[in-house]
C-alpha cells in the first residue's frame, strides 16, 4: 500500500526542458498547495472528527452569493484584471461582496463622458445635499444664529493667536459657502438650459403632430364629402326603385293599352306628352335633405388664442354679410359688389358664386347645408349648398377639367378673387320668398320657420315647407301701442340716432320655435309670441338703434349703436353692460365662452365670459409687415372658438379665439 503522505506531492517538474516550461514553477506549487489543502478539508467526510465544518459553512454561503449573475460578472472581471487578489482572499462573504461591488471595470470607466461643467459630480452633490432635507435647512439656521451669538459674546482682542485662528476659520467657512453658492448657481443655469432644450424639442414635436392632425382632418373632410355623395345617390336609387315597384303594381288603363298597340294615329300627340312625367317637376317636388356634419374639426382648439389661420380677399368692396356652418366648413360672403360667394374654409378656396339677386345682399344665414339670403331687392332666396359641383380633393369643380388657377387658395390677401367656373352652383337654388315691399335687413330661420325683417317696418313669418308667408307683424303698430300706454305722445321717435347714420329699422332678430326676439332702431328689444302675434315683453336699456342680438336658454345679448353690449336675463328682465366701446357696434355673436363684436375698428373686441376679461383679436392687434393699415371690421361670426371677420376692403380673416 502506498504511503498516504505521498498523495499530496507534485511530480518533479525539473525533468522538463526549459523551453517547454511556460509558467513559473514556484507560483504553481504555491497555488497547488492551497488548492490541495482546501479540497482536503472540504471533501473530508462529515463524520470525521478531525474535519473542521468552518470551511464547509463558508463555501455554502459563498456558493449562495456566487449564484447571483451580477456578482458573477463582477468576480470574473476582477479575476481577469487582478487574479492575485482572488488567491489572497480568505473566502469571507463580506470581503467577496465588497470587492465585487466596489470594483468598476475599465470598460465602464472608458464610457464616462467628458463633461464641460466647471464643478465635479461630488461638488454638485455636496452643494445640493442640504436642500434635500429639512435637517440641512435647520443646520444652516443654527449656524447663522451661532455666528450672531459669537459676535455678541465676549470679544477677543485683535492681534492674538486666538483671534487670527478664529478669523481664518470664519473665512474658510465663508469661502466654502461662497463656492457652494457659485456651484448652485451654475446648477440652476444648467437646469434652465436643459428645460429650454426640452421645451424646444416638445414644441417641434407639437408642430409635427399639428401637421398630422391637419392632414387627418383634411382626409376626414374628403371622406365625409364622398359619404354624403354616396348617401344622396343611394337615396335617389331607392326612390327610383320604389317608383318602379309602384308602376309595376298599377293596372294599365285602356288608353295606355291602345297607345302601346299604336291604334291611335296620334301616337306621340300633345296629350301623350302631357301625360309623360317631367323631370323638372319631379325634382322640384323632392324635399331637400338636411345634411349635418358627422364630426367637428378640433385643429383650431390647439392654437393659441389670437392666431391667424387664414386671410383671403373675398370681394372688391366692403363685406355686408357673412356666415359659416362649422369650423373649417363652408362660408358664404356677400358684399356691396352684389356678389354672393361660397368658400371652402378648409382649403381657402372659392367654390362658386350664387346668382339670382338683383341687388346687394344685406343679411344671410347658413344652417347645415341650407342658406338663406335677404337682399335689397326685397326678396329672400333659399339655397341648398350640398348640390354644388365641387371636388374637395383638388382644384376641379364637378366633373369638368378646369385649370388649377380657377381654384387657387388665396395665400396673399391682396390677390384678386378668381371666379370659379360658371354653373358650379346652378343646382343650388330652391325657391324665392316675395312679399316685402322694401329691402330685407334681417332674417333668421330654424327648422321650417323663417322670420324676416324689412325696411317696410314689418316682420314676416314664413313656412319653408310650403314656401309662403303665414303671418305679418307690424312693428310700427307695436311701437305705437307701447308708446300710447306709456305716454300721450303716440308718435314713434328714433332716440339717440346720429344724423349722418341711416340705421336699419329692424336691426336684428332671432327665432326659436314660437319665440321671437327683435331689435329695432328705437333702441327697444321686443320679445314676440308667434302663436298670438303679440309682444310679450319689451326690454328697455339701449339709447341707440339695436344692430345685433342673440339669445340662448337664459340670456339675451344685444349690441347697439350706443357703443355698448348688454346681457339680459330672460327670467328677470335685468341687464348688465360688460363691454363698452368708443365706436358704434355693427356686428356681434357669442358662443359658450366668448362674446365678439365689430365696433368700427381694425380689430374684433372679445369678451371672455368665464374669466371676465377683454382683449382684441384681428389684424390690427398683430404686428405685421404690411405697408398699409388693416381695414375696419364690419362683420364677425364665431363658432366654438373659430372666428371669421369681414372688413371694408373685402378681405376676410380667419382666427382662433
Swiss-Prot record:
Chief location of this protein?
A: mitochondrion
The record, for SUPFAM superfamilies, names: WD40 repeat-like
List where Basic and acidic residues composition bias occurs.
Answer: 249-263
Record bears the keyword Nucleotide-binding: no
Q: Where in the cell is it found?
A: Mitochondrion outer membrane
Cellular component GO terms, alphabetical: mitochondrial outer membrane; transferase complex
Topological type in the membrane: Peripheral membrane protein
The family database entries (InterPro entries) matched by this protein are listed as:
G-protein_beta_WD-40_rep, WD40/YVTN_repeat-like_dom_sf, WD40_repeat_CS, WD40_repeat_dom_sf, WD40_rpt
Q: Where is the composition biased (Basic residues)?
A: 284-293
Q: Which PROSITE patterns match?
A: WD_REPEATS_1 (PS00678), WD_REPEATS_2 (PS50082), WD_REPEATS_REGION (PS50294)
The record's annotation in Gene3D superfamilies points to:
6.10.280.220, YVTN repeat-like/Quinoprotein amine dehydrogenase (2.130.10.10)
Indicate whether DNA-binding appears among the record's keywords. no
Residue numbers spanned by region Disordered: 245-293
- Keywords assigned: Coiled coil, Membrane, Mitochondrion, Mitochondrion outer membrane, Repeat, WD repeat
What is the purpose of this protein? Involved in mitochondrial fission. Acts as an adapter protein required to form mitochondrial fission complexes. Formation of these complexes is required to promote constriction and fission of the mitochondrial compartment at a late step in mitochondrial division.
Identification of the protein by name: Mitochondrial division protein 1
Q: Which organism is it from?
A: Chaetomium globosum (strain ATCC 6205 / CBS 148.51 / DSM 1962 / NBRC 6347 / NRRL 1970)
